[in-house]
Amino acid sequence: MKTHRSALIVAAAILAGCASNAADSAQSKAKPGQIGHVDSEGFTLISDGTWTGWKVNESQNSWSLSEGGFRAQGERSHNFYTGPLAPFKDFELKVDVKTAPNSNGGIYIHTKYQDSGWPWGGYETQVNQTQGDWRKSGSIYSVQDVKADKLEGVVRDNEWYTHHVVVKGNRIQIFLNGKLVNDFTEEPGRKAGKDFERKLSEGTIAFQAHDPKSVVHYRNVRVKKH
């Protein structure tokens, strides 16, 4: 019986290894613009202008496909990454973002899928150039916020920019078009909040549709694990 079990364990390990190698091979063969393509900086593309690997929760009509990515406009809704690379812990995220004037959006990290409501898990990094909320793009929402004067000449409405989030250990850095706008270190022993967790752990990524007056585009989503 032990010999039989050992043989089964070895066979299972071989199959798992084959599956992993097949996935790695498929990823290495992915062309630019295809999910799984790895660029020269080691980032893996996880969005290709379709819904593959993504799941919208409530108010699904708030989302559409446009300009090679996701377009958000409508009642509160969130679009979660559900692909095979999740969960993420220490990692980098790059997203190309474009906002219409007076628009509000958000990018969540270390979060988890939920059917409705504002995501409880993880942190939100704000997307907002000119909408009324004083917390602007690059803010770690209600934790360490960025004001408008820090974004002058960095990002503008109606123009694509790169939103780059780096998570290593207890530190979050946010770069907009290559400029560091936020550098936050989570204090040891930080407790989860009541209304929102606002605490590092691990999880997935989500994009926000904030309200019917806000139009935000998200595309070319790529990640690199550390």
Regions picked out by a protein language model, each given a short descriptive name:
Residues 1-8:
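Bacterial N-terminal signal peptides that target proteins for export
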Residues 8-9, 69:
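Hydrophobic alpha-helical segments
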Residues 9-17:
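Bacterial N-terminal signal peptides
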Residues 19-226:
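Carbohydrate-interacting regions of secretory-pathway proteins
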